[in-house]
Amino acid sequence: MAVQQNKVSKSRRNNRRAHDALVAANPNECSNCGELRRPHHVCPSCGHYDDKEIVAQADEIDLDEDAA
C-alpha cells in the first residue's frame, strides 16, 4: 500500500480539488425544431446544426413487417 512522504496540508489538498467540481448541463433550444440540445452539438431530434441539416433523418421503420 502506498504511504505518503510528507503530510499534504488542507490548503494544498483543497487547491488540487478545485477543478474536480461537476458542471450542470446547459441545454439550448434548437433553432429549427425547438427541442433542447447540447451546445455545439447536432440536434438529436432533427439533425440540424447551425441552421444546416447535418444528419438526414430516416423515416419510421416498422420492424414487424421487415421480420416477416
Curated annotation (Swiss-Prot):
The disulfide bridges present are: none
InterPro entries noted in UniProt: Ribosomal_bL32 (IPR002677), Ribosomal_bL32_bact (IPR044957), Ribosomal_zn-bd (IPR011332)
**This protein's UniProt keywords:** Ribonucleoprotein, Ribosomal protein
Q: Which GO terms describe its cellular component?
A: large ribosomal subunit
The Swiss-Prot or TrEMBL record annotates one GO molecular function as: structural constituent of ribosome
Annotated region (Disordered), positions in chain = 1-20
Q: Pfam families in the record, alphabetically?
A: Ribosomal_L32p
Q: Which domain of life is it from?
A: Bacteria
Recorded family membership: Belongs to the bacterial ribosomal protein bL32 family.
Family annotation (NCBIfam families): rpmF_bact
Question: HAMAP family annotated for this entry?
Answer: Ribosomal_bL32 (MF_00340)
- Name of the protein: Large ribosomal subunit protein bL32
Name the species this protein comes from: Ruegeria sp. (strain TM1040)
Q: What is the lineage of its organism?
A: Bacteria, Pseudomonadati, Pseudomonadota, Alphaproteobacteria, Rhodobacterales
